Amino acid sequence: MYTAEEREQIIDIVDKMSLLRQDFDGAFTWIKENVAMPFDFDGEQQFISDLKQLVKINALKFGKIYEGVLN
């Protein structure tokens, strides 16, 4: 389980990778390799889903569409 500060740091990293660097695939890979909350599976899945949605929205701002971005 992440503290609120840790969650903000993770969101900031993902946001910077996907928005400032436009490294959308790298952001998805970073999420996959670095985000895990072993004692809160439902919370982990929701947090990961929210992070991926952030990347998809940032990609859309640059005209790149990932599947599921409009869901």
From Swiss-Prot:
Phenotypic effect of disruption: Cannot be generated, suggesting it is essential for virus function.
Pfam families to which the protein is assigned, alphabetical: Phage_gp38
Keywords from the named record: Early protein
Keyword Nuclease: no
InterPro entries documented for this protein: Gp38-like (IPR054372)
Induction comment from the UniProt entry of this chain: Expressed early in the viral replication cycle (at protein level). Transcript is detected 2 minutes after infection, peaks at 10 minutes and is degraded to a smaller size by 20 minutes. Some smaller transcripts were detected in bacteria expressing AbiQ (AC Q9ZJ19).
Function noted in UniProt: Involved in escape from killing mediated by the bacterial AbiQ protein upon infection of L.lactis subsp. lactis strain IL1403. 11 distinct mutations in the protein and 2 in the ribosome-binding site confer on the virus the ability to partially escape killing (i.e. the virus grows in the bacteria), in some cases probably by decreasing the protein level.
Name the UniProt record assigns to this protein: Gene product 38
Organism: Lactococcus phage P008
Organism classification: Viruses, Duplodnaviria, Heunggongvirae, Uroviricota, Caudoviricetes
